[in-house]
Amino acid sequence: LEMLKNQNPLALTPRGLGWEIKKPLSILNKTSLACSCGPNYPDDSCGHTGFTGTSLWFDPISKQIVIALSNRVNLSRENNLEAIKRFRIKLHGLLNLNNSSRRMKTLKPTSVVTHE
């Protein structure tokens, strides 16, 4: 799908048409913590985050979708952006533990993944 192909120059964070795209560290040449899903969610997954801390990420290979709904701007709470970021990274890492075996079964030995 065109919307999931990187539309940015290689020096910038990979983004499709409205989606952040997770790429391997060797391609990004920076830490994968820059990605809102964290280092443990699969490469080539795509996602988008919202101002209030909401997040939607999906792995097109295993068909796993992760949706996190939150409200970090509730008037009775202090600004907790860093806590929401840490939560997202932990959530995606934990869910990928269950996803890894399904993902490996889905990949075919002859599959070739290319990066633009």
Label each PLM-derived region with a short phrase.
Residues 12, 77-80:
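Alpha-helix N-cap/helix-start motif
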Residues 19, 80-81:
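Domain-length accessory/inserted modules outside core catalytic folds
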Residues 1-2, 84:
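Short alpha-helical "patches" and their helix-cap loops
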